[in-house]
Regions:
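N-terminal presequence-like segments and the immediate start of the first folded domain
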Residues: 3-81, 85-98, 104-152
Length: 152
């Protein structure tokens, strides 16, 4: 390999590395302390450019790892309130949600979840999918994770 070709290859690799590092610099890890207790091994949300990825929320009392009592409806309501609180802590609203994924310990509780979920939106709903899942965190009946479009 000629020296000129070798130098060109090194410069290209250095440029690619610098570009990748700059792209990584746009990742922002968000933790407000308003919903999740400190010390968990994940961020409550991560912003990459104009997209905010929210970690899954279960129906915990904010600041604790204790599920609210009352079953699927109360857990669903609290999970959605936790999503709203997380969004608001980072300057966003429920209307900024683009997609939600719902995991239910018992897919037969879909209707009960949906009755609560629909009260959190006016007119338009995010794209959504749902599935049954065994072994949700903390023994929860429902977990909801969402993706939001950030406003500038």
């Amino acid at each position: 390999m000629k020296i000129r070709e070798w130098i060109l290859a090194v410069c290209c690799l250095a440029g690619a590395h610098a570009t990748a590092a700059a792209e990584r610099a746009n990742v922002e890890f968000l933790d407000s302390g308003k919903v999740l207790p400190a010390g968990l091994p994940f961020s409550e949300a991560v912003r990459v450019g104009d997209v905010v990825y929210l970690s899954g929320q279960v129906g915990i009392v904010p600041g604790t790892l204790k599920l609210v009592p009352g079953g699927i409806r109360e857990e669903s309501r609290q999970a959605m309130e936790n999503i709203r609180a997380t969004l608001e802590a980072h300057g966003l609203a429920m209307s900024d949600l683009a997609r939600c994924t719902v995991m239910l310990a018992d897919i037969g509780e879909w209707t009960a979840f949906n009755d609560v979920y629909t009260t959190f939106f006016v007119g338009r709903y995010p794209a959504r999918s749902a599935f049954g899942a065994k072994g949700l965190a903390l023994g929860a009946r429902v977990e909801v994770e969402c993706i939001a479009a950030a406003r500038d």
